Amino acid sequence: MPQYQELPCGGQVLDIDTALKDGILGGGPELGDAAAGDGGKQPVELRKMMDELDAAGDGGGDEAVPAVFICPISLEPMVDPVTLCTGQTYESANISRWLALGHRTCPTTMQELWDVTPIPNTTLRQLIAAWFSRRYTRFKKRSADFHGRAAELVHALRGTAVPKRQPLKGQARVAALRELRSLAAAHQSVTKAIAEAGGVGLLTSLLGPFTSHAVGSEAVAILVSGVPLDADAKAALMQPAKVSLLVDMLNEGAVDTKINCVRLIRILMEEKGFRPDTVASLSLLVGVMRLVRDKRHPDGVAAGLELLNSICAVHKPARSLIVSIGAVPQLVELLPELPTECVEPALDILDALAAVPEGRIALKDCPRTITNAVRLLMRVSEACTRRALSMLWVVCRMAPEECAPAALDAGLGAKLLLVIQSGCGPELKQQASELLKLCTMNCTSTVFISKCKLTKTIQ
C-alpha cells in the first residue's frame, strides 16, 4: 500500500522521505520559501520561472525534470497538479479539458472514474515549486556570473578595465575574444551584456585593413551570435575597408569563419541604408560560390545560397556577374545532391539568373539542365516544380528543335501529364500545358506515346 505522510504545511505526498532523500526538495528551507505567499499567485510565478528557464535552454539544469512532475497528457511539467480518484495526477487545465469532452475514464489507466472531482495536490505543487526555484536561483547566479565575465572581457579589450590597463593585444586579445565568443554562444543573454558594455563599438573597430584573420574571425563570430546591432553599427560595418576584410576571410578563412562572414553580410543587407554595389564584387561572389560547392558542410551550402538569393533580389546588375563566374552550370550540377531545404533557394537563384540573356544562354548550354530539371518535377514542392518548369520553358523556347526532343527523351512528357492531372494550382497546370504544347509541336502522337512509355490503357 502507498504510504502517505502529513506535512506541517498541509497536504499529502507519496513517500515524502524518499523525495527528501533523493534531493527533489534540496533541503527544507526551500520548500518553505516556495510555499510562502499567496497560493493563487504561486502557479503564475512558477510558470514564469519555467518559461524563462525553457527559453534559456536550462529547464532542468544538470538534472532531468523528475518524472513525477510531468503531466501524462501534455508531457510538460505541471504548475497546478490535481489528482483523480484513481490516484493519477495531471495538470488541472489538461484534465479539465479531458473531462469537458465527456470522458469518464482516467487517461492513463483507462479506469472508470467513480468521482470526477479533481483534488488539488498542494504538496506536489510545493515540491515542483521548490525544485524549479532551486534551478531558477542557480540559473540566475550563473547568468550574473556570465554577464559579469563578459563585461570584464569587453573592458579589458577596450582598455577601460579597473584598475586602468592598456587594451589587450596580440594573443591575449585573440584569447579574450575567443572566450567572449564561447560565452555568447552558450548563453544568449550574454549578447545583451556585451552590447551594454560597449562591445558592439569595440568589435566594429577591430575590423579593418590591418586586422589579422584570427582577430577578425572571432569578432565576426560574436557579431552574428545575436548581439544587437543598431543602424550606426551596421553603417560602420559597411565601410569599404571592413567589407574588404569580410571578403578576404570569406575566401581564405576556415569554414565556420566563411559562414559567419556570409551571415554578417546578410544582416547588413537588411539595413535600409545598404548600398547594393557593396556586394557587386567578383571576389565576394567567387567566395560564396566556393562555399556553396563544398558539400561537406551543409550549413555553409545553405548560408551561401541564401546570400546569393538575396544578392539576386536586391542588386539586379549583380546577376550578370554571378553568371560570369560560372554559377549557372555549377548550381545545375549541384541540384540532385542538395538537401531538400536547399533545392528551392538554388532554383530561385537560377530563375533570377535566367532573367538576363547571359543566364538563359548558360542554362541552354549546360548539358545537365534538362535532365536535372525534369527530375525535380513533382519531387520536392509545388514551388520547386514551378521553378523547374520555368527553367525548361526557357531552354525549350530558346532552341525548340534541339531541346524539346531532349526533354521528351528525359521523361518530360509523362511528368507534364502528371502535373496537369495533379492537385497543383491552376497557374502551374497552365504552365505545364503550354510547355507540353511547345515540346509536342513537331512530335507525332505515336512518338509522344512511346517516349512517355504509356500503357495501352492510359493511351
Swiss-Prot record:
Organism superkingdom: Eukaryota
Pfam family, one: U-box
Description of the deletion phenotype: Dwarf phenotype with erect leaves and short grains. Dwarf phenotype is mainly due to decreased cell proliferation and disorganized cell files in aerial organs.
Tissues expressed in: Expressed highly in panicles at flowering time, at moderate levels in vegetative shoot apices, leaf sheaths, leaf blades, and elongating internodes, and at low levels in roots.
UniProt cross-references to InterPro entries, sorted A to Z: ARM-like, ARM-type_fold, PUB22/23/24-like, RING-Ubox_PUB, Ubox_domain, Znf_RING/FYVE/PHD
Pathway assigned in UniProt: Protein modification; protein ubiquitination
Protein location: Cell membrane
Molecular functions per Gene Ontology: ubiquitin protein ligase activity
Main location: membrane
GO biological process, one term: regulation of brassinosteroid mediated signaling pathway
Induction: Slightly down-regulated by brassinolide.
Domain U-box: 64-138
Membrane topology, from the record: Peripheral membrane protein
PROSITE patterns: U_BOX (PS51698)
Keyword Repeat: yes
Reactions that this protein is recorded to catalyse: S-ubiquitinyl-[E2 ubiquitin-conjugating enzyme]-L-cysteine + [acceptor protein]-L-lysine = [E2 ubiquitin-conjugating enzyme]-L-cysteine + N(6)-ubiquitinyl-[acceptor protein]-L-lysine
ARM repeats: 188-229, 231-270
Function: E3 ubiquitin ligase that may function as positive regulator of brassinosteroid (BR) signaling. Possesses E3 ubiquitin ligase in vitro. Acts together with the heterotrimeric G alpha subunit GPA1 at the plasma membrane to mediate a BR signaling pathway that affects plant growth and development. Does not seem to be involved in gibberellin or cytokinin responses.
Quaternary organization: Interacts with GPA1.
Protein name in the entry: U-box domain-containing protein 75
Gene: TUD1
